[in-house]
Amino acid sequence: MSGFGAAALLSGSSAAAGTRSGSSDSLEKIDMSLDDIIKLNKKEERKQYSPKMKRGLQQNRTQQFRTPGSKWGIQQQKGYGKNHLGHRKKIVGKKRPYGVITGLAAKKAMGSHKGISPLNRQPLSEKNTQRNYPILKKKPNLQRQTEMQRKQIPALRRPAPLSRRIGNKLNQQKDTRQATFLFRRGLKVQAQVQPTEDLDNQAAKRTRQWRTSTTSGGILTVSIENPGAIITPISQKLRLTRTPVPPFLMKKDQSEEKKIPKGVPLQFDINSVGKQTGMTLNERFGILKEQRTALSQNKGSRFVTVG
């Protein structure tokens, strides 16, 4: 563009800018490019037309919710090691020790030692703990009292005769249950139960309450049927309750004569041969062969045995 065009633009922009822009501003704008001049003019226009009262109200509203040194309600730390999200950075290698008293307990403990250096403090003893730490001394006393009360209460409330009667009744009930169970299985049971008056008299004689009696209140006698001991013969068929077995499955009586198995009958006893140490088996068999040949010759049989 020509110099005249630039001068015309500058004059228009200076008129729009108002009284704030002086001769010094116009001289600076001569050296700037057209784009920079347009941007500056827009900024100045925005500043003029934006009302100042609204800005003040908005700032007051935001300041109500903000604290000094905070951004968007998040507290920010100042100095070294701050985190932009508002949380402290963990120091590497440093852990919180166990057993550290915190909160109200720490304030109470520190209240007694305020203004006293650790070197001048009194050593821990029973008297000092009562003075300085009354909370620590109260707890064991309360625990002891509760333990003593627990031990005394059952001793006072224990009704001795009632408990014994209940125990005897339970034993009797147990005996009756056992008797019914065995009776259903086919066993005759006679439960001899002692009367309650005798049991009460026995309980009164005893002095020590905590020892339980070894003898039970009821005596249980069981009689089991033994068929072998009965003299009168009872047929086995009547005794069986199962279904009758068919005759072809029944085992045959062993009274029948045992059939001799087929094979060559030995004419000598092997055990006796083994006992005779002077004669061998070959000699014995040789003698038998000679006897056979002699018998066959006498009978005149057709067969000839070659020795």
From Swiss-Prot:
The keyword Transport applies. GO terms for cellular component: nuclear speck; nucleoplasm. Pfam families: FYTT (PF07078). A motif (UAP56-binding motif) lies at residues 26-44. Keywords: mRNA transport, Nucleus, RNA-binding, Transport. The keyword RNA-binding applies. Residues 1-25 have a biased composition (Low complexity). GO terms for biological process: mRNA export from nucleus. Residues 1-28, 41-85 are annotated as: Disordered. Required for mRNA export from the nucleus to the cytoplasm. Acts as an adapter that uses the DDX39B/UAP56-NFX1 pathway to ensure efficient mRNA export and delivering to the nuclear pore. Belongs to the UIF family. PANTHER family: 40-2-3 PROTEIN-RELATED, UAP56-INTERACTING FACTOR. This is UAP56-interacting factor. It comes from Gallus gallus. The lineage of its organism: Eukaryota, Metazoa, Chordata, Craniata, Vertebrata.
